[in-house]
């Protein structure tokens, strides 16, 4: 199974390491044509506005086509990229996930934290690393909330798309990546 990791900036290498440990064949995606080689895509954390600049209009359109039709997983800035609506400030998202997100809602870099929250994935509680994280302000009717922090969704799934506002790749817990690989294998939303 070939999984792409968008490797333009951000913490893409941490995702590569987790995915390879779980047995995936990982392609570091740096050009739009590489999207044709993969079955699923991870959009890592980083800076969402920088992703937009580095992708350009043509690259963004290729990314949008991929994430709206194939299994995709975004963390932090990747979740912003997958969103239907982005605010603080407003910017475009791919619309692959029916969510409204607020960028940098949990504060500045210095306010980053490692917290534990309840999660509906097998195994219960999950350690979650937040770094200038976005907050999911609203979810559409087809979005399943898998975990919350202070009443706000932090891990959501809709069809073939999975998003986390935290960084599961920075902990030893591989459950979120395992769920994504299961979604890719099943070609759909998978099972918890």
From Swiss-Prot:
Citing just one GO molecular function, the answer is: pyridoxal 5'-phosphate synthase (glutamine hydrolysing) activity
- Lyase: present as a keyword of the record? yes
Which pathway does UniProt place it in? Cofactor biosynthesis; pyridoxal 5'-phosphate biosynthesis
Reaction catalyzed: aldehydo-D-ribose 5-phosphate + D-glyceraldehyde 3-phosphate + L-glutamine = pyridoxal 5'-phosphate + L-glutamate + phosphate + 3 H2O + H(+); L-glutamine + H2O = L-glutamate + NH4(+)
PROSITE patterns in the record: PDXT_SNO_1, PDXT_SNO_2
| Annotated residues for binding of L-glutamine | 46-48, 103, 131-132
**Which sites are catalytic?**
76 (nucleophile), 167 (charge relay system), 169 (charge relay system)
- What keywords does the record list, in alphabetical order? Glutamine amidotransferase, Hydrolase, Lyase, Pyridoxal phosphate
Taxonomic superkingdom: Bacteria
Among the Pfam families in the record, one is SNO
Q: Which HAMAP family match?
A: PdxT
Q: What does this protein do?
A: Catalyzes the hydrolysis of glutamine to glutamate and ammonia as part of the biosynthesis of pyridoxal 5'-phosphate. The resulting ammonia molecule is channeled to the active site of PdxS.
Describe its assembly: In the presence of PdxS, forms a dodecamer of heterodimers. Only shows activity in the heterodimer.
**Cross-referenced NCBIfam families:** PLP_synth_Pdx2 (TIGR03800)
This protein's name: Pyridoxal 5'-phosphate synthase subunit PdxT
> Which organism is the protein's source?
Koribacter versatilis (strain Ellin345)
């Amino acid at each position: 199974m070939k999984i792409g990791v968008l490797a333009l900036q951000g913490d893409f290498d941490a995702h590569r390491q987790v995915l390879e440990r779980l047995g995936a064949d990982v392609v570091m995606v740096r050009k739009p044509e590489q999207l044709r080689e993969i079955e699923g895509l991870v959009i890592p954390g980083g800076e969402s506005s920088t992703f937009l600049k580095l992708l350009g209009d043509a690259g963004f359109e290729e990314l949008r086509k991929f994430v709206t039709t194939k299994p995709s997983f975004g963390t932090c800035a990747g979740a912003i990229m997958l969103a239907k609506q982005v605010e603080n400030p407003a910017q475009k998202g791919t619309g692959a996930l029916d969510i409204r997100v607020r960028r940098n809602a949990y504060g500045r870099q210095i306010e980053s934290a490692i917290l534990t929250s309840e999660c509906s994935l097998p195994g219960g509680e999950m350690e979650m690393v937040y770094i200038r994280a976005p907050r999911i302000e609203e979810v559409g009717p087809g979005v399943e909330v898998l975990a919350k922090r202070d009443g706000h969704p932090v891990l959501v799934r809709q069809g073939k798309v999975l998003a986390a506002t935290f960084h599961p790749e920075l902990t030893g817990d591989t459950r979120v990546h395992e769920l994504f690989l299961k979604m890719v294998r099943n070609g759909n939303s998978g099972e918890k």
